[in-house]
Amino acid sequence: MGFTEKQEALVNSSWELFKQNPSYSVLFYTIILKKAPAAKGMFSFLKDSAEVVDSPKLQAHAEKVFGMVHDSAIQLRASGEVVLGDATLGAIHIQKGVVDPHFVVVKEALLETIKEASGEKWSEELSTAWEVAYEGLASAIKKAMN
C-alpha cells in the first residue's frame, strides 16, 4: 500500500503546527543531543555552545529537516518514491560522519517533536505518516551516501 491522501493530509496539518512555534526547533535538537550527545559536533550551530540555544541557523536547519520530510510525504503520495532535491545531501552526511544509528535518533526526535507540536491531535496514524515519510527521506539520503 502506498502513501495515502489521508497520511499526506496528516503530515501537512502537523507541519503547519510545527512551523507556528520556533521553540519546536530547539526541542528537536535538545532531544537529539539527549539521545546522542556526541552528535553535537555534527551541527555547526551547536558545537560551540554548552546547550541548545535558539539561533537563525538552528531554526533554518530544523525547518529544512522537517520541510524535507514534509516534501517526502508529498512525493510518496504522488509517485511512491522520494527523490532528493539537493544532490549534495549524501556527501554532506558522509562528511559529517553520519551513520545508520544517527538516522534512528533523528527519527525519534522528529516524532517526539511532532507529538509535542500536535498536542491532542497526536495519534498512531499521525505518527505512522511521519515515520513513513521520514523513512522515505532517510532511504534516499542513505542511497546518495553510497
Swiss-Prot record:
It is found in: Cytoplasm, Cytosol; Nucleus. Belongs to the plant globin family. Residues 2-146 form the Globin domain. Gene3D superfamilies: Globins. Root nodules. One of its GO terms (molecular function) is heme binding. SUPFAM superfamilies: Globin-like. O2 binds at residue 61. This is Leghemoglobin Lb120-34.
